Amino acid sequence: ALFAVPYTMTDASQVHLVAEDEVGNRAEASFIDKFTPRPITTDTIQLNDAYINKVVPEIMGQSPEVADQGDPVKNYVEINRNLRKKNAATLVDLAHKSEPRFLWTQPFQPMPNAKITAAFAQRRTYLYNGKPIDQEDHLGFDMASVTHDAVPASNDGKVVLARFFGIYGNAVIIDHGYGLMSLYGHMSQLEVKEGQMVKRGQELGRSGQTGLAGGDHLHFTMLLQGLPVTPVEWWDPHWIQDRIARKLGAALPYHP
């Protein structure tokens, strides 16, 4: 099985393997012997009325689960905080339906010729009129290229979401099997449908600035059992070979 340690965890002894038989006998043990806490960087996002009045109506118009707070700034916080949580819960639900087989055989690849403008595990404080109104964690990589650039699939898999998806705007999520997924957000247009099988490098759509995006870019992240994990490791063929393929052996038909 593949599992992820939450990016906020500082003590791996909190992770336990639990076994229980049919009559309720239960055994529990810690099994992680090497763990390095992930540093969380910080950033400040300056909000203005022009940005808020652009993103809030679009998201609320396509997200009926967002309760209108009667004020654009309050609506922004409702989206940034509570819709973000609902989106995260959906990611966990999707993981429960992941294919029980590996759908990929090659290393994952990033968007080509793109500049990274924001990285994984960045704690953002949002300021409006100089005062903090929210704080949330950015859990992916923002990758900017030319406007409406082609967005390729990072690896083979099955499209499990292709629609407007809350804070991510127009988004695609690919299931790579056993709870491993990749997410592509803020796209201007989508070229794939839910249920479709895609190949590594196949165009999924075009970059854009839908959802909470302030400019044209791709928000990309990897997910394991619904938990965001840093894409950097999955882009590294040596990391996959050492941490995944070597341990799984013939169960993973990996060809770096």
Give the label of every model feature segment.
Residues 1-122, 127:
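Non-catalytic extracellular/periplasmic "stalk"
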Residues 109-255:
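Catalytic cores of peptidoglycan-degrading enzymes
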